[in-house]
């Protein structure tokens, strides 16, 4: 991954983390890796565990960012979530939500819950 792409991703994840904190989420992990799978942000609010993908665009895009969740991405997120739950047994009884935080430099953040 290029340094520019990594820096852009880190910036988007920082904005998304602050956005989730403003919604009373507790951030548990950022860039959680399990095998070859990654989840950008893992957070918890009440009894729900949120596994969130972050998409960051500097300019406005005329498409629905939820379409970035193809079957391969869903499979990898599920695998990473199972790994996190196996490593963190205290969250075994929480509800789980797979989400997207779309970050646009001009429009702010939009949060999509329960995508799959």
UniProtKB/Swiss-Prot annotation:
InterPro entries: Restrct_endonuc-II-like, tRNA_endonuc-like_dom_sf, UPF0102_YraN-like. This is UPF0102 protein LA_2381. It comes from Leptospira interrogans serogroup Icterohaemorrhagiae serovar Lai (strain 56601). The lineage of its organism: Bacteria, Pseudomonadati, Spirochaetota, Spirochaetia, Leptospirales. Belongs to the UPF0102 family. GO terms for molecular function: nucleic acid binding. It comes from the Bacteria. Pfam families: UPF0102.
